[in-house]
Amino acid sequence: MKKHKNIMIQGTGSSVGKTLIVAGLCRIFAQDGYRVSPFKSQNMALNSFVDIEGLELSRGTVIQAEAGYEIPRAFMNPILLKPNSDNNSQVIINGKVAYTADAKNYFSHSKELKYLLHLDEFHSLLFHRH
């Protein structure tokens, strides 16, 4: 099995252009013949998109997937936080609403959510097909 390669894009804060840079890289690599898929383990976004299975993911991840000629899927964005107010967010796990929590309560679940925050070598994202 050919080993996949990963690239991580990091920024200094919110709204600094990470999503746009990743979308551009997805398009460039896809046009060069590589199969690319975005993966953002956790995202905070007010608006979301519903994929072909009826599951939610962030619109930014959708733009990145489409830039790479991939079908947007919720497993590309396993944890989505949708703010309800200044104090709490709806927590969406694998595309489904799980619960609403403030920051303290969300972090109390962090051990349960940790498995979602990385890709292992057999993750479905690495092997899915159109």
Regions found by a protein language model. Give the residues of each.
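Flexible phosphate-sensing "switch/lid" loops adjacent to ATP/NTP-binding sites
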Residues: M1-H130
